[in-house]
From Swiss-Prot:
This is Purine ribonucleoside efflux pump NepI. One of its GO terms (molecular function) is purine nucleoside transmembrane transporter activity. It is found in: Cell inner membrane. It catalyses: inosine(in) + H(+)(out) = inosine(out) + H(+)(in); guanosine(in) + H(+)(out) = guanosine(out) + H(+)(in). The lineage of its organism: Bacteria, Pseudomonadati, Pseudomonadota, Gammaproteobacteria, Enterobacterales. Belongs to the major facilitator superfamily. DHA1 family. NepI (TC 2.A.1.2.26) subfamily. Involved in the efflux of purine ribonucleosides, such as inosine and guanosine. Residues 1-21, 76-85, 129-147, 197-215, 277-281, 327-343, 388-397 are cytoplasmic. It comes from Salmonella paratyphi B (strain ATCC BAA-1250 / SPB7). Residues 43-54, 107, 169-175, 237-255, 303-305, 365-366 are periplasmic. It is a multi-pass membrane protein.
Length: 397
């Protein structure tokens, strides 16, 4: 609670909004998210070039999420009073270094090391992005500034997979990461030029954030968050081999499918507020239920290209409700400890991404093409049941 008050005090103390810094933060977030998901659309050529299976190559997503999980939990304890401006610059440098390491990787180990650097930057930056934004604009402008940040995330999610697939077919997967490194350099330059000094707190009163899990319905909510994101990554990480081998899409066709998925996600995010105004619980239970049915449809009729393409669109629309819905749940049910709850949420999501991609890859290599879909669908169904039975939503006052 003390940290929330402190953040509000800082926001109130800003005389004018620093929009250049806000957009610099948004650009960094967009680049981090884009690079995080690039392997999804480049999995097959990466695996072939490095002489590994697609399931093993998918662990490049796993290690990023795993490192990001720990980074989001412990970054504030590690950096303590360090000026946040220097920390953000460091994260932008790590983004650039990660892309270059992946681009020049001649072994699976170096690939994982590069992706681990990305995870460090991703988790730390994502955990700090909201508080950074609140210190760059007056209190009355904070919602608008935050919308810029989350808008950048939506755009990154739209373009990452299809752009990677398209460029990978033209210039090769290594040059795609070289291009991403250039974007990282732009992040460094923009942050250096626009971000003001943002001193850290000289001291903190230590509180156990995990005590929040003892509140009624909170543990169930975190379990549901874990299962929904694990289910998403169990399937989405391996969408390329599934769609190319099950439905017979070529690279161009897959690019269109991924683009459709991204656009659907953007549309779903844009209209999510209308659904959430009606019922947060219905959205949090209904979206994973629809995803479970979509996974079942792909298992049964996924060899039909039209069906597979339509399911990709439905999947994008439905899953868009999930992250927005759970953020809304935190602001409703954990409003007094929203910052700490958000830190736990980021860690849970990254752990879920790690486990989902890891188990999905193992299933793909050992149990066949449909196994990631079955795993994803099962987790989504369990999510819907947990939300319906155990998760509590505080009504909007």
């Amino acid at each position: 609670m003390n940290e929330n008050i402190a953040e509000k005090f800082r926001a109130d103390g800003v005389a004018r909004p620093n929009w250049s810094a806000v957009f610099a933060v948004a650009f960094c977030v967009a680049c981090l998210i884009t690079v995080e998901f690039l392997p999804v659309s480049l999995l097959t050529p990466m695996a072939q070039d490095l002489g590994i299976s697609e399931g093993v190559a998918g662990q490049s997503v796993t290690v990023t999420a795993f490192v990001a999980m720990f980074s989001s939990l412990f970054i504030t304890q590690i950096i303590q009073a360090t000026d946040r401006r220097y920390i953000v610059i460091l994260f932008a440098v790590l983004l650039t270094a990660s892309c270059l390491m992946v681009s020049f990787a001649n072994s699976f180990t170096l690939l994982l090391l590069g992706r681990a650097c990305l995870g460090l930057a991703l988790g730390g930056f994502w955990a700090m992005s909201a508080s950074l934004t609140m210190r760059l604009v007056p209190a009355r402008t904070v919602p608008k500034a935050l919308s810029v940040i989350f808008g950048a995330v939506s755009i990154a999610l739209v373009i990452a997979a299809p752009l990677g697939s398209f460029l990978g077919g033209i210039i090769g997967w290594r040059n795609v990461f070289n291009a991403a490194a250039v974007m990282g350099v732009l992040c460094v330059i923009w942050v250096v030029k626009s971000l003001p000094s943002l001193p850290g707190e000289p001291s903190h009163q230590k509180q156990n954030m995990f005590s929040l899990l003892q509140r009624p319905g909170v543990m169930a909510g975190m379990i549901a968050i874990f299962m929904s994101f694990a289910g998403q990554f169990a399937f989405f990480t391996y969408i390329r081999p599934v769609y190319m081998n099950l439905a017979g899409f070529d690279v161009d066709g897959l690019t269109l499918v991924l683009l459709s998925f991204g656009i659907a996600s953007f549309v779903g995010t844009s209209f999510s507020s209308y659904v959430l105004k009606r019922s947060v619980k219905l959205a949090l239970a209904g979206a994973p239920l629809l995803l479970a049915l979509s996974a079942l449809t792909l298992i049964v009729w996924g060899s039909d290209k039209t069906v597979a393409a339509v399911i990709a669109i439905i999947w994008g629309l439905a899953f868009a409700l999930v992250p927005v819905g759970w953020s809304t749940w935190i602001t409703r049910s954990l409003a007094d400890q929203a910052e700490k709850a958000g830190s736990i949420q980021v860690a849970v999501i990254q752990l879920a991404n790690t486990c989902g991609a890891a188990v999905g890859g193992y299933a793909l290599d050992n149990f066949g093409l449909l196994s990631p879909l079955a795993l994803s669908g099962g987790l989504m169904l369990l999510t819907a049941l947990v939300v319906a039975a155990k998760v509590r939503i505080t009504p909007m006052s």
